[in-house]
Design a protein with these regions (language model features):
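Stable alpha-helical elements in mature extracytoplasmic
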Residues: 39, 43, 96, 130-133, ...
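Generic recognition of flexible, low-complexity loop/linker segments
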Residues: 96-100, 132-135, 211-215, 226, ...
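Aromatic/acidic polysaccharide-binding cleft in carbohydrate-active enzymes
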Residues: 108-188, 204-207
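Conserved, mostly hydrophobic/aromatic
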Residues: 13, 85, 137, 145, ...
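Short, charged, surface-exposed secondary-structure boundary motifs
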Residues: 95-96, 119-124, 258-260
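Active-site proximal loops enriched in glycine and acidic residues that flank catalytic Cys/His/Asp
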Residues: 60, 89, 111-116, 146-150, ...
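Active-site neighborhood of glycoside hydrolase catalytic domains
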Residues: 1-118
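Carbohydrate-binding surface patches
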Residues: 194, 205-242, 249, 253
Length: 260
């Protein structure tokens, strides 16, 4: 409510960031049973009593423990307050999002954190994040993709004690002067966020190991296709939409966003 009074709407919260990582600061380990109990006995009723519509999203940790989200969602009392589950990809496979979706199709899926370590290998980091997150997460039912973090100084600050000491911001802001540098995650997100506007929906496109891709239909009727050449050589490919076909070529490791 205090944030709302300042003009900032909190769309969603998770009970705890990375509940199976006790090494962040502040942090503590939280089991799936404890999270479910907290949601159904405290957080959910408190939101309900205050008339808050802010979403409660469970898990908020890696893809190697999809069972955690499923255990929270299987708790009837907790599930009544839970909008969906959130994932990171520091371990596991992005297909875990589909595993949870298939078990609980009425609940939403979100991708809520991945950082680029500094100093970045631009080409390698761009390809990995686009492959797994910008393309992989929506293909596995995620409604969003968040990169962490928005901005840092040249020494990767500020961060909490015990927090990430080499997380490269999308922007590096100089500690003196006005210099702002755009980094890898700026371009990772820009390939989608500039074109796939809120209200867009994913539409079907043919999967390929060489030309990774994901397609969207925007609210104003435009089609957006994000493609990555995941091979080691220049790759020709075709885009067919209804009766129209266009032939294109993409260099090794290149990413492109196409709009029509």
């Amino acid at each position: 409510k205090a944030m709302k009074a300042l003009g900032i709407t909190i769309d969603a919260v998770t009970p705890q960031n990375e509940p199976q990582n006790p090494y962040n600061n502040p942090s503590m380990q939280l089991s799936s049973g404890q999270e479910a109990d907290f949601i159904k006995s405290a957080l959910g009723p408190a939101f309900q009593g205050a008339g808050l519509t802010t979403k409660i999203i469970c898990w908020d940790h890696n893809c190697d423990q999809a069972s955690y989200a499923q255990e929270v969602l299987s708790d009837v009392g907790a599930s009544a307050f839970v909008d969906g589950s959130a994932f990171h990809l520091y371990a596991g496979d992005i297909s875990a999002l589909s595993t949870v979706h298939n078990a609980y199709p009425a609940k939403n899926i979100y991708f809520t954190e991945q950082y680029v370590a500094g100093p970045s290998n631009f080409g390698g980091d761009l390809a990995w994040h686009v492959r797994n997150l910008i393309i992989g997460a929506p293909r596995n039912w995620s409604r969003n993709v968040l990169e962490w973090n928005l901005a840092s100084d040249p020494n990767y600050n500020p961060h909490t004690p015990g927090g990430c000491s080499n997380c490269l911001g999308a922007l590096t802001i100089a500690t003196s002067g006005t210099l702002v540098s755009r980094n890898t995650s700026y371009y990772i997100i820009a390939h989608a966020s500039k074109f796939v506007r809120p209200g867009s929906v994913r539409i079907e496109s043919t999967a390929s190991d060489k030309i990774r891709n994901v397609a969207f239909l925007t609210p104003d009727g435009k089609k957006v296709l994000i493609v990555l050449n995941d091979g080691g050589a220049t790759q020709p490919f075709n885009i067919q939409y209804q009766s129209r076909v266009i032939s294109l070529t993409l260099g090794a490791g290149d990413v492109a966003t196409l709009v029509w």
